[in-house]
From Swiss-Prot:
Pathway: Cofactor biosynthesis; biotin biosynthesis. This is Malonyl-[acyl-carrier protein] O-methyltransferase. Keywords: Biotin biosynthesis, Methyltransferase, S-adenosyl-L-methionine, Transferase. It is an enzyme of class 2 (transferase). The lineage of its organism: Bacteria, Pseudomonadati, Pseudomonadota, Gammaproteobacteria, Enterobacterales. CDD domains: AdoMet_MTases.
């Protein structure tokens, strides 16, 4: 089971510098934006808003935005940058919101931290008006393959995070009319520590919380020998899934 308190702590620690390292979130969010039309003057829920990067984008278009996050520090960062109209510290699996409130519910790379993906999707559908949409991006099984492969060579007890399969994500979508798309994006880094640092600094170090915190020179060399590599550097892949649910 996912420990949401630890996740909130991990993202909270990353909040101050999150926007300097959140290239992955922005790439996924921009792809998600391309899946739908641009909306103006509607009510939007940004569920798992982080620092409010996309909340601010939606608000600048004249929309009324509610920014929601489970991390108080992330929400405070969003508030300090005036990203939204309203701010709500809450769990996506138990939204303290009445039915049929928002025209659009948006969640970018947050649902993978829920214990019950289908419950979170159901909640987003519940608070969205009939005729509205729930749009989301998430990470699917197969992500971080390179890290998992290499790390098991220095820690045989390491257990990777179990991201849902694409099919399981499809089955979680409330039996509604849904468009699902996915893409594998591979990033490259000049050093393996940079690759690991990239997901640590966006709060996602929780996924590797069961590995030892001290990497000796010997272990680093072993990681280098086993981490997939090409002329561009050490590789780290994410399987992104994008969903649009029509209500």
């Amino acid at each position: 089971m996912i420990d949401k308190k630890k996740i909130a702590e991990a993202f909270g620690k990353a909040a101050a510098n999150y926007d300097n390292f959140s290239v992955i979130q922005r790439i996924a969010g921009n792809i998600l934006l391309s899946k739908i039309e641009t909306f103006f003057n509607i009510s939007i829920l940004d569920a798992g808003c982080g620092t409010g990067w996309f909340s601010k984008k939606w608000r600048q278009l004249g929309n009324t935005v509610t920014a929601l996050d489970f991390s108080k520090n992330m929400l405070l960062t969003a508030k300090n940058t005036n990203s939204a109209d309203y701010y709500l510290h809450a769990d996506m699996e138990q939204l303290p919101i009445c039915d049929n409130i928002f025209d659009l519910s948006w969640s970018n790379l947050s649902l993978q931290w829920c214990n019950k993906f289908n419950k979170a999707i159901s909640e987003l559908c519940r608070v969205t008006k009939p005729g509205g949409m729930v749009v989301f991006s998430t990470i699917a099984h197969g992500s971080l393959y390179e890290f998992n492969k290499a790390y098991r060579t220095i820690n045989s007890s390491y257990q990777e995070n179990k991201f849902l399969s694409i099919n399981d994500i499809k089955l979680s979508c409330c039996n509604k009319k849904t468009l699902i798309d996915n893409i594998l994006i591979t990033f490259s880094f000049s050093k393996i520590l940079e690759a690991m640092y990239s997901f640590k600094k966006i709060g996602a170090n929780y996924i590797s919380s069961n590995h030892s915190k001290i990497l000796t020179k010997k272990k680093i060399r072993q990681l280098q020998e086993n981490w997939p590599y090409n002329p561009n550097g050490y590789l780290l892949s994410y399987r992104f899934v994008f969903g649009v649910i029509y209500l």
